[in-house]
Amino acid sequence: MAQRTRLGDLLRPLNSEYGKVVPGWGTTPLMGVFMGLFLVFLLIILQIYNSSLILNGFTVTWGG
């Protein structure tokens, strides 16, 4: 038998929506926007690392 704890009682409302699916697209478009922004961020970091994005007054040296 499961033991009831004060922490479990506090966290129970967070788990009450488990298994329920909101009809329609829900927050999928918002997730797509954030994925796109993350992709742009990664591309900028890659271009800085490759030195293909030139930043005036900013030198990058990878040697130790």
Curated annotation (Swiss-Prot):
Pfam families: PsbH (PF00737)
Record bears the keyword Membrane: yes
Domain of life: Bacteria
InterPro entries xrefs: PSII_PsbH, PSII_PsbH_sf
Membrane topology field: Single-pass membrane protein
Primary residence: membrane
GO biological process: photosynthesis; protein stabilization
Cellular component GO terms, alphabetical: photosystem II; plasma membrane-derived thylakoid membrane
Keyword vocabulary terms for this entry: Membrane, Photosynthesis, Photosystem II, Thylakoid, Transmembrane, Transmembrane helix
Cellular location(s): Cellular thylakoid membrane
Protein family: Belongs to the PsbH family.
Oligomer status and interactors: PSII is composed of 1 copy each of membrane proteins PsbA, PsbB, PsbC, PsbD, PsbE, PsbF, PsbH, PsbI, PsbJ, PsbK, PsbL, PsbM, PsbT, PsbX, PsbY, PsbZ, Psb30/Ycf12, peripheral proteins PsbO, CyanoQ (PsbQ), PsbU, PsbV and a large number of cofactors. It forms dimeric complexes.
Protein name, UniProt field: Photosystem II reaction center protein H
Organism: Crocosphaera subtropica (strain ATCC 51142 / BH68)
